[in-house]
């Protein structure tokens, strides 16, 4: 989707908390804001 591999990694190589929607590092085991362990990777393909 992105033009450069570095840009794509910056945009999509993060995890999103399923409870509070906070952005977390890709290496995170739990959310930095609420401590929830349910994390997903940010979607690389648009929905809809």
Curated annotation (Swiss-Prot):
A GO cellular-component term linked to this record: ribonucleoprotein complex
Gene: rpl40e
Disulphide-bridged cysteine pairs: none
Keywords, comma-separated and alphabetical: Ribonucleoprotein, Ribosomal protein
Family assignment from sequence similarity: Belongs to the eukaryotic ribosomal protein eL40 family.
InterPro entries: Ribosomal_eL40_arc, Ribosomal_eL40_dom, Ribosomal_eL40_sf, Ribosomal_zn-bd, Zinc_ribbon_dom
UniProt KW Ribosomal protein keyword: yes
Superkingdom field: Archaea
Protein name: Large ribosomal subunit protein eL40
Keyword Ribosomal protein: yes
GO biological process: translation
NCBIfam families: PRK04136.1
Source organism per UniProt: Methanosphaera stadtmanae (strain ATCC 43021 / DSM 3091 / JCM 11832 / MCB-3)
One of the record's GO molecular function terms: structural constituent of ribosome
